């Protein structure tokens, strides 16, 4: 097991995701030049960088240490004005100096392999379903389900194939629902509703970055690499603290539709109609 309460574990998770090939445009933590490539190419998604001083890594082999300003990341990646935004604070939690050419310490390979094997199990499950000619949609959430979620999932099921509730269960901000609660609630939902074996629960160990529109693209790219056929993008996707407009991620990702190799189901959330009940 791994300790999700350890704030440094997010970098081990990022590292494992990169090495497993789940991060489409990265094969290691980014250097300075690669970061600017991410900034220029918004369809790359959210950049994963490694700050100095993370206990899981040996920095002795590092030959490139670079500094990145908070203003740059705030303006070009998060595209917000709130300097104390939670996503920005997480990004710079260990300072403004970063590197990329490091090695994983031997004593943490067990935790690294746990992440790899957990996600590999999901990939194998998806491949098993796809081998039966199923069309698979990933439904992202970090909240417990409400009736609106059920309506969206039912729409997805009515359109085509099977739906996998696929939350990111890496590190999260204070106030987000714990992974154990999501696991318990969604499994109970599936067991109590008649979904005819078309709705599944399959989380992936990956981190929330709270990057708004850029992270919505990041989520699309991860689902492509996991092996999904389709991903749902909706209202308030991957933001926090109301710094993004409700449909900002929706509009941002829709403009880049030609850049994705999987289908996207765009929705504007669900609403209750008092007139029609």
Where do the PLM segments sit?
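Active-site cores that bind ATP or allylic diphosphates and position pyrophosphate for catalysis
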Residues: 1-277
């Amino acid at each position: 097991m791994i300790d999700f309460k350890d704030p440094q574990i997010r970098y081990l998770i990022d590292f494992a995701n990169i090495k497993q090939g789940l991060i489409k445009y990265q094969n290691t933590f980014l250097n300075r030049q690669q970061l600017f490539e991410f900034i220029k190419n918004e369809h790359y998604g959210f950049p994963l960088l490694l700050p100095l001083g993370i206990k899981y890594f040996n920095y002795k082999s590092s030959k490139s240490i670079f500094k990145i300003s908070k203003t740059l990341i705030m303006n070009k990646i998060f595209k917000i004005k709130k300097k104390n935004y939670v996503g920005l604070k997480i990004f710079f939690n260990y300072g403004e100096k970063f590197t990329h050419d490091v090695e994983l310490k031997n004593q943490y390979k067990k935790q690294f392999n746990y992440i790899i094997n957990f996600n590999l199990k999901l990939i194998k499950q998806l491949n098993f379903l796809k081998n039966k000619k199923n069309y698979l949609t990933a439904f992202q959430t970090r909240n417990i389900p409400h009736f609106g979620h059920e309506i969206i999932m039912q729409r997805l099921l009515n359109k085509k194939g099977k739906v996998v509730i696929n939350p990111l269960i890496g590190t999260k901000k204070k106030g987000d629902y714990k992974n154990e609660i999501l696991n318990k609630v969604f499994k109970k939902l599936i067991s109590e509703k008649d979904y005819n074996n078309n709705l599944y629960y399959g989380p992936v160990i990956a981190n929330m970055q709270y990057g708004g529109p850029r992270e919505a693209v990041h989520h699309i790219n991860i689902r492509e690499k996991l092996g999904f056929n389709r991903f749902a993008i909706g209202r308030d996707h991957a933001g926090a603290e109301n710094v993004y407009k409700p449909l900002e991620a929706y509009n941002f990702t829709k403009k880049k539709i030609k850049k994705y190799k999987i289908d996207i189901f765009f929705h504007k959330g669900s609403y209750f109609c008092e007139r029609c009940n």
